[in-house]
Swiss-Prot record:
Pfam family, one: TIM
Protein location: Cytoplasm
One of the protein's GO biological processes: glycerol catabolic process
Protein name per Swiss-Prot or TrEMBL: Triosephosphate isomerase
Organism: Chlorobium phaeobacteroides (strain DSM 266 / SMG 266 / 2430)
Example GO molecular function: triose-phosphate isomerase activity
Source organism superkingdom: Bacteria
InterPro entries the record matches: Aldolase_TIM, TIM_sf, TrioseP_Isoase_bac/euk, Triosephosphate_isomerase, Triosephosphate_isomerase_AS
Length: 249
């Protein structure tokens, strides 16, 4: 039985002070000793250290991104070792906004995954198709390529989580049904099985990241290949986020 994992991605929201308030609200609402599923939050870089001091081991601290080089002349970038030292145990790689706003390719995502793993971080690697790709009938090709190329040259996926983000269902007014999400999650698991074997694929946790809300979380998380969520907007409200977390139990 795969343990569900729910991570709140705060994106470019919340000052340090606001982040501390939200983190405190989440930990208080979850209560002491919550073990029903793995829970993490990904505040902005500026708040990581302070939030980590506040939450301790009660919540996994996740970085929203990192560079693929350990150091050097890369103005504005942050390395995996830097976020690890700030208290992070995990990092997101290849989020759809990084791909579409900043031009990150599958090859770049692959380098980030490898570097983060080498620093001992868990990696949440994202994959997903756009509305144009969905309507063009190439969802399978796009997602399979993202998974295959993102995991190229990696031997051990035990510290990897994959998050499926149907970009076409985020902010477009279109909604992915639980069946549509499950179909792609199964495709991802089968792709990983082809690469790493059935046993490794069976252990892999695959999150769903397409506008999860308290109202649809339970149904999504009941699907056999959906192992939790990578939560965007709803994670900025403690009550909504905790409701989603508890739907995973």
């Amino acid at each position: 039985m795969r343990k569900k994992i729910v991570v709140g991605n705060w994106k470019m929201n919340k000052t340090v002070t606001e982040s501390l308030v939200l983190a405190a609200e989440v930990t208080a609402a979850l209560g002491e000793g919550f073990t029903g599923c793995d829970v993490g939050i990904a505040p902005p870089f500026t708040a990581l250290y302070e939030v980590g001091k506040l939450t301790g081991s009660r919540l996994a601290l996740v970085a929203q991104n990192c560079h693929f080089e350990p150091d050097g002349a890369f103005t504005g970038e942050v390395s995996a070792s830097m976020v690890r030292e700030a208290g992070c145990s995990a990092v997101i790689a290849g989020h759809s906004e990084r791909r579409h706003c900043f031009g990150e390719t599958n090859a770049i995502v692959n380098r980030k995954v490898k570097h983060a793993l080498s620093e001992g971080l868990q990696v949440i690697m994202c994959a997903g198709e756009t509305l144009e790709q969905r309507e063009g009938g190439v969802t399978g090709d796009v997602v399979t390529a993202q998974v295959r190329e993102g995991l190229l040259g990696i031997d051990d996926i035990s510290n990897i989580v994959i998050a499926y983000e149907p970009v076409w269902a985020i902010g477009t007014g279109k909604t992915a049904t639980s069946e549509q999400a499950e179909e792609v999650h199964l495709l991802i698991r089968n792709t990983v099985s082809d690469l790493f074997g059935e046993e490794a694929a069976g252990r892999l946790r695959i999150q769903y990241g397409g506008s999860v809300k308290p109202s649809n979380a339970k149904e999504l998380f009941s699907m056999p290949n959906i192992d939790g969520g990578l939560i965007g907007g709803a994670s900025l409200n403690a009550a909504d986020f905790v409701a989603i977390v508890k739907a995973a139990v």
